[in-house]
Amino acid sequence: MTNIRKTHPLTKIINNSFIDLPAPSNISAWWNFGSLLGICLIIQILTGLFLAMHYTSDTATAFSSVTHICRDVNYGWIIRYMHANGASMFFICLFLHVGRGLYYGSYMFSETWNIGIILLFAVMATAFMGYVLPWGQMSFWGATVITNLLSAIPYIGTNLVEWIWGGFSVDKATLTRFFAFHFILPFIISALAAVHLLFLHETGSNNPSGIPSDSDKIPFHPYYTIKDILGALFLILTLMLLVLFSPDLLGDPDNYIPANPLNTPPHIKPEWYFLFAYAILRSIPNKLGGVLALVFSILVLAIIPLLHTSKQRSMMFRPLSQCLFWLLVADLLTLTWIGGQPVEHPFITIGQLASILYFMILLVLMPIISIIENNMLKW
C-alpha cells in the first residue's frame, strides 16, 4: 500500500514541497532565509491577530489602546514587542535573502525573482502602514511625509493624495483604512509566497557554485528540515533577546508622544529598514526626481537579470565581482546611516555620493566587471 503522504491530494503537495523535495547537496546557511521569512510571516500574523483584538483604529483612542495592550492585556507587552521587533527581524532576513540572490545569481530564475520583488514591495507597504497604527508623533508625520510624496505625480498627484487620505490631511479616515490594509496585506503576502515557492519548485533551488546540481540531489527531509530548525532557533533567540532586553532599541522615542498635527518633530525619519531608501529620496533636491529614485532603488532589482553579462552564474569564483558586491553592502550601510542623520553638511554630500554609487554599482560597474572577468578566463 502506498503511503498516504504521497497519495492524498493535500499531503501530496506538502510532501513534494517540504519532505521528498530534491534539494542540492551543497546549499549553505544562506539558503535558510526563505524558511526564516516564512516563520517571520507566521509570527507577524499571529501576534498581529492578537493585537487587532485589542486595538482601536480611531484617532482618539489608537494611542491609548496600544498603551492598554502593554499595561492591561495579559502578556500584551510581549505580543506588542514581538510584533514590532518581528518586523525588524523580517527585514533583516529579507535583505539577507535578496543579497544571497544577488551574490549567487538566483535572479536567473526570473519568475521567482520577479514575484520576490513584488513580495518585497508588499512587505514594505505593510510595514509602513503598521508603523502608522500606534498614532504616535513619528506615525503621524511619517504617514504625512510619505503619502505626500505621491503629490509629485504630475496632474493627478494632489487628487491621489487626498483620495488616499480620505480628506485634506492624515486623519481618522486614513488611520482606519491603513488598519484595514495592514490587516489584509499579510494574507496576500502569504498567497504570493506560495506562488514564489511554486515557481521555485519548477526549477529547483540554485546552489553556491551556480552549477546545475541535477546529478547530486538529496531529500529535503531530514537534511534541510533539521538545518532550517537550527536557523529558526537562532531567529527566535535573536528576536526574544531583542524583545526581552531592549524592545525599544530599534524604535523611535518620538513615537511615545501622541500624534500632534500642530507640532512637527525636529527629525522625521522612518524605521531603520527604510532609511537606505529614504536617504536616496532625500539626496535628490527635486521632489519628483526623489520619488522616482526612491521607487527605482527597489525596482532596479527587476533589471538585474537583464544586466547579467558573466559566463558564470554565481559570484563564488569571481573575486572582482565579490569586491563590488561587498562595496554595495558597505554603500547600503552608509545610506542607512545617512537616512537617520539631519539634512545638513556633510551628510547631504555623503548621501548624494552613496546614492550615485548604489546605482552605478548595480547598473554600470557589475556588468562591466563581469565582462572583464569573462576575458580573464582566456588569459
Curated annotation (Swiss-Prot):
Cofactor: heme b
Gene3D superfamilies: Cytochrome Bc1 Complex, Chain C
GO MF annotation list: metal ion binding; ubiquinol-cytochrome-c reductase activity
Biological processes annotated in GO: mitochondrial electron transport, ubiquinol to cytochrome c
Cofactor: how and how many bound: Binds 2 heme b groups non-covalently.
Binding site for heme b b566: H97, H196
Amino-acid positions noted as binding heme b b562 in the UniProt annotation, renumbered to this chain: H83, H182
Transmembrane segments: 33-53, 77-98, 113-133, 178-198, 226-246, 288-308, 320-340, 347-367
CDD domains associated with the record: cytochrome_b_C (cd00290), Cytochrome_b_N (cd00284)
Keywords tagged on the record: Electron transport, Heme, Iron, Membrane, Metal-binding, Mitochondrion, Mitochondrion inner membrane, Respiratory chain, Transmembrane, Transmembrane helix, Transport, Ubiquinone
Pfam family for this entry, one: Cytochrom_B_C
InterPro entries associated with the record: Cyt_b/b6_C, Cyt_b/b6_C_sf, Cyt_b/b6_N, Cytb/b6-like_sf, Cytochrome_b, Cytochrome_b_C_euk/bac, Cytochrome_b_N_euk/bac, Di-haem_cyt_TM
Membrane topology per record: Multi-pass membrane protein
GO cellular component: mitochondrial inner membrane; respiratory chain complex III
Places the protein is found: Mitochondrion inner membrane
Superkingdom to which the source organism belongs: Eukaryota
Annotated residues for binding of a ubiquinone: H201
Note: Heme 1 (or BL or b562) is low-potential and absorbs at about 562 nm, and heme 2 (or BH or b566) is high-potential and absorbs at about 566 nm.
Role description: Component of the ubiquinol-cytochrome c reductase complex (complex III or cytochrome b-c1 complex) that is part of the mitochondrial respiratory chain. The b-c1 complex mediates electron transfer from ubiquinol to cytochrome c. Contributes to the generation of a proton gradient across the mitochondrial membrane that is then used for ATP synthesis.
Oligomer status and interactors: The cytochrome bc1 complex contains 11 subunits: 3 respiratory subunits (MT-CYB, CYC1 and UQCRFS1), 2 core proteins (UQCRC1 and UQCRC2) and 6 low-molecular weight proteins (UQCRH/QCR6, UQCRB/QCR7, UQCRQ/QCR8, UQCR10/QCR9, UQCR11/QCR10 and a cleavage product of UQCRFS1). This cytochrome bc1 complex then forms a dimer.
Entry's family note: Belongs to the cytochrome b family.
Protein name, entry field: Cytochrome b
Native organism: Mustela erminea
Gene: MT-CYB
